[in-house]
């Protein structure tokens, strides 16, 4: 293209968000104009673009930028975008580091978003950390109360989700039907969570009843509807409905090698006729450690992140293996 013609067209295209360089080429990618930086859409051999980004966050060459309403990139300091705060240096959004804002410790995540408090590392693995408000990083090798709840953190800063070796009972149990989580507490006030269990409660047509009840140990192989059998049955006394139990995923026979894989994979979602299903290892633990414990069955507030479903998150499902006809947590196999 003739440079003089391009400069003439530039006045028209500039108003539409395009820019021609002095060479006559359409601006693409990160471009500096009159001391300010902009990012233009990148063109390819198959498609010509080139419009400037405005009022948005832009990912360019593995870095984040924030474009103003006129397209120029914000240079430095704190910027609010879409309700969140970001910190910039030389136009680049800073990521994966600790930063104080107004004297308060926080963390800039992988996308640069400033957050305080909990940082989710993995929903799939139920891994979270907590930004220590009194330090310069995550809480490590310590316990601390957050909103009245006592948490423990390991040397890597991860929330510890099983403290039953430290707290050996008596326990208090709470089941959240909405989030599919059973949380075991070391105190009656339920401020010291010590174990999280992934559960399936009743389907909408056969709901697990809400209320306050008591757990009592029942049978090693619990007869259920069908007929079928669940391992390590613990009765929810007073819940009615012909008998509500905590038990493992039911099998067609009273042995460990006829597990219905489809039902096992539903753990964490409503699936039962009213009972509270768990994996075998957790059913066994409740059977052995919660005889006589109070249990409260509630509808909690829905949480989108599994790691935040309950104070200790939602325990990850142990994947099936081998012939997939047995519970992988079953100590008998």
PLM features: what roles do these ranges have?
Residues 7, 67, 131, 189-202, ...:
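Short amphipathic beta-strand/extended segments with alternating polar/hydrophobic composition
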Residues 125, 140, 175-181, 229-230, ...:
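A short, compositionally biased
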Residues 122, 185-187, 237, 298:
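A generic structural motif
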């Amino acid at each position: 293209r003739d440079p003089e013609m391009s400069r003439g067209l530039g006045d028209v295209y500039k108003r539409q968000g395009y820019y021609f360089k002095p060479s006559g080429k359409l601006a693409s990618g990160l471009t500096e104009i009159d001391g300010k930086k902009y990012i233009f859409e990148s063109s390819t051999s198959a498609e010509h673009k080139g419009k400037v980004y405005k009022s948005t966050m832009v990912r360019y060459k593995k870095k984040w930028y924030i474009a103003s309403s006129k397209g120029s990139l914000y240079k430095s300091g704190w910027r609010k975008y879409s309700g969140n705060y970001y910190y910039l240096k030389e136009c680049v959004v800073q990521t994966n580091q600790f930063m104080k804002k107004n004297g308060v410790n926080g963390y800039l995540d992988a996308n640069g978003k400033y957050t305080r408090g909990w940082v989710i590392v993995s929903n799939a693995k139920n891994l979270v950390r907590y930004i220590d408000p009194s330090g310069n990083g995550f809480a490590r090798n310590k316990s601390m109360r957050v909103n009245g709840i006592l948490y423990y953190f390991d040397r890597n800063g991860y929330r510890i989700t099983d403290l039953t070796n430290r707290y050996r009972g008596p326990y208090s149990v709470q089941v959240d039907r909405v989030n599919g989580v059973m949380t075991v507490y070391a105190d009656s006030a339920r401020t010291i969570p010590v174990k999280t269990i992934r559960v399936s409660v009743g389907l909408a047509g056969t709901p697990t009843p809400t209320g306050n009840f008591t757990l009592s140990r029942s049978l090693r192989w619990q007869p259920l509807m069908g007929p079928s059998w669940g391992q390590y049955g613990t009765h929810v006394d007073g819940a009615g409905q012909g008998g509500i139990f905590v038990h493992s995923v039911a099998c067609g026979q009273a042995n460990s090698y006829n597990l219905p894989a489809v039902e096992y994979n539903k753990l964490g979602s409503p699936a039962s006729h009213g009972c509270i299903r768990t994996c075998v290892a957790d059913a066994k633990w409740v059977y052995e450690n919660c005889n006589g414990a109070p249990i409260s069955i509630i509808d909690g507030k829905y949480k989108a992140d599994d790691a935040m479903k309950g104070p200790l998150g939602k325990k990850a499902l142990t994947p099936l293996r081998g012939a997939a006809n047995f519970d992988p947590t079953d100590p008998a196999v």
